[in-house]
Amino acid sequence: MKEETFYLVREDVLPDAMRKTLEVKKLLDRKKADSVADAVQKVDLSRSAFYKYRDAVFPFYTMVKEQIITLFFHLEDRSGALSQLLQAVADSGSNVLSIHQTIPLQGRANVTLSISTSAMEEDIHTLMNKLRKFDFVEKVEILGSGA
C-alpha cells in the first residue's frame, strides 16, 4: 500500500469545493444538518463533490496525533452513565487526563474530560459520534485542543 503524503495548506488557497466539503463535515459532526443531502444544500455543494473530497481533506487539528483534547458533555443523571462514557473513551485508545463533573441538577450533569489522543486508534470525530449514540448523552463538543 502506498504511504499517504499530507500537505499543510492555508484555507484561502483551497478550491471552493474543498472548503465547502470541510463545512459539510463540520455541519454533520455538529448535528447541524440531518443528512449529507441537507448539509451539501446548506453550503451549495454537489453531493458528488462532497464524496470526492470527504476522505481527502481534513481540518489541521484532526491530523495532529499527539495532542490533548478537552470534551464537554451534557448528560442525563443515570447510574453508570459516566462509567460507560469513560469505557468508550478508553476503548478508543485515549488516555483520560482529567475529569470534572458538576453536581446533577434537575436530572442533568455537565462533565468535562481532558484526554490525550497520542495512542488513539480512531479519529476524534469517530469517537464523538460513538459518544453521541449513548441515550444519556444530550450534548458532546470539543471545548479546546492543544499539543
Swiss-Prot record:
<feature type="domain" description="ACT">
    <location>
        <begin position="70"/>
        <end position="145"/>
    </location>
</feature>
<dbReference type="InterPro" id="IPR002912">
    <property type="entry name" value="ACT_dom"/>
</dbReference>
<comment type="similarity">
    <text>Belongs to the UPF0735 family.</text>
</comment>
<dbReference type="InterPro" id="IPR045865">
    <property type="entry name" value="ACT-like_dom_sf"/>
</dbReference>
<protein>
    <recommendedName>
        <fullName>UPF0735 ACT domain-containing protein YszB</fullName>
    </recommendedName>
</protein>
<dbReference type="InterPro" id="IPR008310">
    <property type="entry name" value="UPF0735_ACT_dom-cont"/>
</dbReference>
<dbReference type="Pfam" id="PF01842">
    <property type="entry name" value="ACT"/>
</dbReference>
